[in-house]
C-alpha cells in the first residue's frame, strides 16, 4: 500500500525536502508529464492542509512556480488545484493568470473558476469586468459569469438557508447542486433545466451537479438515467458547458458514460478543451475493457492538449488497474 508524501514527511521528519523534491519535478520540463501531474497532486495535498502547516505556503508557491511551463494542460491543472485548496494565499497567483491576455484561454478559464471556488469576493470586480468585455474569449467570459454568480450565492442568505443534498464528492464545484425541495426534482425536470440555453449558466450547472449526485453510488437506480441525461449536454453550443459534462463523467467513473466520452474524444471537429477532458475522464475508467486501447489510438493526435491528456490518461489508467491508494509521486528513499 502506497503512503502519501505527507505521511512520509511526518514519519521521516523531512517534509521540507519533500516539497522541494516535488517542486523540482513539477517545474522541470525534462520530467515526464505524467510524473509532473503526480507531483502536482502530491503538492495539492500539502497545499490543502487544514489547519495550514509549515509546508502549506511552500506547496502553494511550488504549484504557482510551474505557471511558466509552455504546457497549457499542466497550467490549467495548476489553476484547478489552487482553487481546491480553500486557501486565499493562492488568489494573487490566480488573478495574474486570469488577467494575462497572452495566456491560453483554457488556463485563464480555470483561473477564473478557481477564484469562484475560493469564494473570493475581492476578485468580483475583475471577474465582472472580464465577463462584460465583449472582446474576451467566450470561454473566459462564461467562466467569469459562473464564478461571479457562485461568489454572490456563497455570500448570500440563500447559501445559508438552502438545503443541499450531501454529496459523495469532496471537490469544490463551480456551482452547488440545486437545493432539495419538498417535492424532489425528477431526472426529466433536471434535464430540462440542464439543456435550457435560455437559463443562466450557473443555474444549468446547478442542475448538472444535482444530476451528478444522483449517480453516486453507481448502483443507484437513478445512476444510468442521470448519466444519459448528462450526456445530452454534449450537444450544447457552449464548449465550456460540454467540457464540464466530461469533467463530471470523470468524477463519476461510471461505465455508462464510456460511449459518449469515446464519441467526444473521437470527434475531430470538437474543440481541444472538450476532447482533452473526455480523454482524462476515460483515464479514470482505465480498468474497464477496451478503454486503454481506445486511448492509445490518440497518442499521436494532431492537437497538443489532446496528446498531453492521453499521456496523463494512460498513466491514470495504469493507476486504476494497479490498486495504488493515491495518485501521487513518492520521493525516492535515499540509500
From Swiss-Prot:
As recorded in UniProt, coiled-coil segments are none
Q: Which residues does the record give as Fe cation 2 binding sites?
A: 243-244, 276-277
Cytoplasm among keywords:
yes
Q: What class of enzyme is it?
A: oxidoreductase
The pathway that the record names for this protein is: Protein modification; eIF5A hypusination
- Cofactor descriptive note: Binds 2 Fe(2+) ions per subunit.
EC number(s) recorded for this UniProt protein? 1.14.99.29
Q: What PROSITE patterns does this protein's entry cite?
A: HEAT_REPEAT
Q: Which reaction does it catalyse?
A: [eIF5A protein]-deoxyhypusine + AH2 + O2 = [eIF5A protein]-hypusine + A + H2O
Q: Which domain of life is it from?
A: Eukaryota
Question: Where, in residue numbers, are the HEAT-like PBS-type repeats?
Answer: 74-100, 107-133, 203-233, 241-267, 274-301
Task: List the subcellular locations.
Answer: Cytoplasm; Nucleus
Q: What is its main location?
A: cytoplasm
Q: What are the names of the required cofactors? A: Fe(2+)
Q: What does this protein do?
A: Catalyzes the hydroxylation of the N(6)-(4-aminobutyl)-L-lysine intermediate to form hypusine, an essential post-translational modification only found in mature eIF-5A factor.
Task: Return the protein name.
Answer: Deoxyhypusine hydroxylase
